[in-house]
């Protein structure tokens, strides 16, 4: 695979421009013979998590394919599952540009995208058109202009729209780029949101005749006590899984680098240890009552194994994939 040579050219251009061009290219080739440029076969490493049979434990994290436009293309690369979104009830432009910055010296990215997406109805149309038969996670969030006290209405709206199309649904309450979102991770706000989603899950299970698991995505910037409190809420409300973690607000590991002081969430190598620690603490607090999907700084099979040893059952990649491309998927799957 010739990704390193391609990356050299791509990295000469603005990060978001290249992202948009890549999405267009993958969308147009996902089900065509041209997917031979990135299609690859990986080893079967089947496992069952949240009652779902995964062909392998390596998934694409949310954020790369926000609108569900390239599902078949990512599947062709060997991912065991693909998570699309974050999607909101209404389309929104996100934050002002520039809003994504590469920090290659640290194998990192800082983004402050702000849930830019074309809205849940558009995502639904794309998922239907893809006719994808693999494992699809759909990550849902709230619109920026929705007051915090009404946040659960946004999550419920998205949940109802995507329920029949998703293999699992992720509730994103941990992006640092939507004001007030992370406050939903704590105490009564979290319990009220989870209780409402769980009640809706029961109604939708009856309506569609199938149970779609709910996972919650949390931040890496949590104390040990906060992790324990979140774990208790997840268990008490019967949530099916947890994704750990989102991007960090810390700038440890990028001090002095170009763009290192830009606002937004930091992902990639610098978040690896923070994420792994949260997974370890979560695993201890959850006591095998629900599974963890580990994400944050995975750039090799060793990194992935570190997450699994800390207590994760599955892993996801994003920033490592930007830097290494499809070969990373094969390297991780075959190296587990």
From Swiss-Prot:
Class of this enzyme: oxidoreductase
Transmembrane segment boundaries: none
Chain sites annotated for binding FMN: 62-66, 86, 139, 172, 217, 245, 268, 297, 318-319
One term of GO molecular function: dihydroorotate dehydrogenase (quinone) activity
Details of cofactor binding: Binds 1 FMN per subunit.
Catalytic activity: (S)-dihydroorotate + a quinone = orotate + a quinol
Active site: 175 (nucleophile)
Pathway: Pyrimidine metabolism; UMP biosynthesis via de novo pathway; orotate from (S)-dihydroorotate (quinone route): step 1/1
Primary location: membrane
GO cellular component terms given for this protein: cytoplasm; plasma membrane
Subcellular location as annotated: Cell membrane
Superkingdom of the source species: Bacteria
Cofactor: FMN
The keyword Nucleotide-binding belongs to this UniProt entry's keyword annotation: no
The UniProt record lists the keyword Cell division: no
Enzyme Commission number(s) from the entry: 1.3.5.2
GO biological process, one term: 'de novo' pyrimidine nucleobase biosynthetic process
Membrane topology: Peripheral membrane protein
Record's subunit section: Monomer.
Stated role: Catalyzes the conversion of dihydroorotate to orotate with quinone as electron acceptor.
Family: Belongs to the dihydroorotate dehydrogenase family. Type 2 subfamily.
Name used for this protein in its record: Dihydroorotate dehydrogenase (quinone)
Protein species of origin: Colwellia psychrerythraea (strain 34H / ATCC BAA-681) (Vibrio psychroerythus)
């Amino acid at each position: 695979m010739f990704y390193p040579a391609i990356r050299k050219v791509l990295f000469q251009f603005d990060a978001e421009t290249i992202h948009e061009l890549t999405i267009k290219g993958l969308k147009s080739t996902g089900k065509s013979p041209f997917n031979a440029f990135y299609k690859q076969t990986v080893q079967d490493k089947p496992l069952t998590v949240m009652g779902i049979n995964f062909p392998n434990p390596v998934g694409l994290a949310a954020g790369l394919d926000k609108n569900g436009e390239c599902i078949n293309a990512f599947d062709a690369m060997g991912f065991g599952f693909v998570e699309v979104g974050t999607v909101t009830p209404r389309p929104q432009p996100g934050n002002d540009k520039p809003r994504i910055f590469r920090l290659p010296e640290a194998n990192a990215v800082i983004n402050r995208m702000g849930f830019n997406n074309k809205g849940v109805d558009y995502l639904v149309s794309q998922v239907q058109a893809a006719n994808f038969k693999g494992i699809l996670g759909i990550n849902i969030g709230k619109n920026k202009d929705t007051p915090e006290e009404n946040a659960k209405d946004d999550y419920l709206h998205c949940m109802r729209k995507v329920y029949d199309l998703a293999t699992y649904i992720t509730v994103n309450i941990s992006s640092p780029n939507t004001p007030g979102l992370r406050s939903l991770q704590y105490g009564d706000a979290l319990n009220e949101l989870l209780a409402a989603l769980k009640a809706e899950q029961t109604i939708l299970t009856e309506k569609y005749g199938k149970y779609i698991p709910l996972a919650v995505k949390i931040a890496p910037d949590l104390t040990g006590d906060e992790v324990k409190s979140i774990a208790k809420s997840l268990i008490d409300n019967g949530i099916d899984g947890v994704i750990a973690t989102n991007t960090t607000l810390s700038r440890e590991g990028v001090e002095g680098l170009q763009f290192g002081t830009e606002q937004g969430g930091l992902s990639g190598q610098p978040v690896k240890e923070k994420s792994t620690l949260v997974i370890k603490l979560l695993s201890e607090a959850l006591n095998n009552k629900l599974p963890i999907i580990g994400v944050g700084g995975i750039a090799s099979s060793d990194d992935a194994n570190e997450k699994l040893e800390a207590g994760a059952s599955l892993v996801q990649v994003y920033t490592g994939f930007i830097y290494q491309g499809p070969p990373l998927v094969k390297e991780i799957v075959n190296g587990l």
